[in-house]
Amino acid sequence: MEPATSRAPRSRFVVWLHGLGDTGRANEFLADSFPTTAAFADARWAFPTAPTAPVTCNRGMLMPSWFDIHDAPITSVSVRDEEDVLRAVQSVHAMIDREIAAGTNPQDVFVFGLSQGGALGIASVLLHPKTLGGCAVFSGFLPFNSSFAVRVTAQAKKTPVLWIHGQAGSLIPIKEGRDGIKFLRGLGMSCEFKVYDRLGHSLEYYELDYCQRWVEKILHRSGREGLIRRVSRNIFLCSNLFNSS
């Protein structure tokens, strides 16, 4: 689904990438879960849905999946097909690049993702040639090994990252969050790591609230707060984007 072709000045654009077995439509409510502030008052949201594919760690069951996962608990070595990840990244880039071509400032583009979607989100940001507004990873992991570092451009390294993880999560252990932040900081990136001791593998309102405040903070630092405009959010339900031609 192509973004709207309005010629009005483009507002901030947020891509939300869902977790394994979920859909974009089921996450639409998140656009209204962020408080109406300068950061998200007029944000345009996209909720793509992953293609349906067999997932090895779920005994080959067909479900929406950005790429195959071989093992659970999930770690970076649970992903064994790099090309599978890169195909997903290219589709995220296509969505972002269409928005930029339509007039959205790259620094007004944010990529958020939960679990497998968080893994795809951080991979997409690291491989994008431009500095984007930011990336928030909720209980995610790195879907690659350390050799991936040579592919990250100098511009991508300037994109700020928030990584939120639960100490009580067992599907994607807290070690994956710590290892991810260590990798990003090794690249010289600006990262924040927020751990909630009692949080399992789920998404809670207080995480969204923390993310919103993080976005406001980085916008303030960059002088891009803008005016608070109480207008309706535009939501793009990009269903099965990755299966479209």
Swiss-Prot record:
GO cellular component, one term: cytoplasm
Protein name as it appears in the record: Probable inactive carboxylesterase Os04g0669700
GO molecular function: carboxylic ester hydrolase activity; palmitoyl-(protein) hydrolase activity
UniProt record, GO biological process: regulation of plant-type hypersensitive response
PANTHER family: INACTIVE CARBOXYLESTERASE OS04G0669700-RELATED, LYSOPHOSPHOLIPASE-RELATED
Catalytic residues as annotated in Swiss-Prot or TrEMBL: S115, H201
Family: Belongs to the AB hydrolase superfamily. AB hydrolase 2 family.
Coiled-coil region(s): none
InterPro entries: AB_hydrolase_fold, LYPA1-2/EST-like, PLipase/COase/thioEstase
Domain of life assignment: Eukaryota
Pfam families: Abhydrolase_2 (PF02230)
